[in-house]
Amino acid sequence: MAERLLQSMSRVAGRCHPDCVKASDEQEDYHASQNAALVAVNLISSARLILKLDAEFTEYSAQFLMDNAGKEDDPGEVDQQRNQVTTENCLRYLAENVWTKKENGQGGMDQQRPVLTVKDCLELAFKKGLPRREHWAHLGCTFKAPPFACQIPRVPVKGEVVEVKTFDEAFKLLVHQPIGAKLHLFSPQIDNVGEGVYKGLTTGNETHYVGLRDVLIASVEEFEGDSVAIVKICYKKKLSFIKVSLSVRFLSVAHDGDKSKFIAPTGLLVDFCVPRLSIN
């Protein structure tokens, strides 16, 4: 029965219940925890491929991290009978969670959870392992995972999170594998970057600071005389690779007198981290 469940989930991977589509359409352009989870699983997938722990690039479930963040295992409350993959349990789950309209879905759950960081997600993966992406609900699913989801196989992930502050330190890590970072976003520069180089803040009254976004740095290369990082970013619900200048530094991000918006001299990419996996 468990094998049939996995086969069914693989066949419908990426498909959404209408409630999920509606929730996604209503969601803001940026969901910090979902983005952190997505960066974390991409870092793990890349590291496992480089270390030859996976024969090919294997996608793991970011939604698994969303579903399990903040949850503590309590053996005393485990209902072994409901945790089994049976026809009865599947029908019970559908009746209680899918066929019955819920007024307070994932959005209410999200409001009760702290915002996840990439480090949080990596540490959770080290603790619980990760299922393959196609074996779990899609990222942003509005339905809670069924009790019998504990039967879905997980790949064990062991290691530690390495954090560094400067790009010089980060570059040493990047030699071995992609790394996570946060990117200062300015609009409309990020909207208009296209195939060019994102250089952040430029002169002009139209510029405004969007905030920090979790990204994955894939590599560093030279482009038109500038050192640039090739960065994978989710912006306005779309994944893309952009070139980010490594030479740009700036002092402030606002001209309206709000001191809370002023920051110390910095590059566009900050707060670097990487999962250092154990192969034992």
UniProtKB/Swiss-Prot annotation:
Organism taxonomic ancestry: Eukaryota, Viridiplantae, Streptophyta, Embryophyta, Tracheophyta
Principal place of residence: cytoplasm
GO biological process annotation, one example: heat acclimation
Keywords: Cytoplasm, Nucleus
Tissue: Expressed in seedlings, leaves, stems, inflorescences and siliques.
Cellular component, GO, one term: cytoplasm
Coiled-coil positions: none
Subcellular location: Cytoplasm; Nucleus
Name of the protein: Protein HEAT-INDUCED TAS1 TARGET 4
Induction record: Target of TAS1 (trans-acting siRNA precursor 1)-derived small interfering RNAs in response to temperature variations. Up-regulated by cold (at 4 degrees Celsius), but rapid drop of expression after a temperature shift to room temperature (at 22 degrees Celsius). Highly up-regulated in seedlings exposed to heat shock.
Family according to the record: Belongs to the heat induced plant HTT protein family.
Function statement: Mediates both basal and acquired thermotolerance.
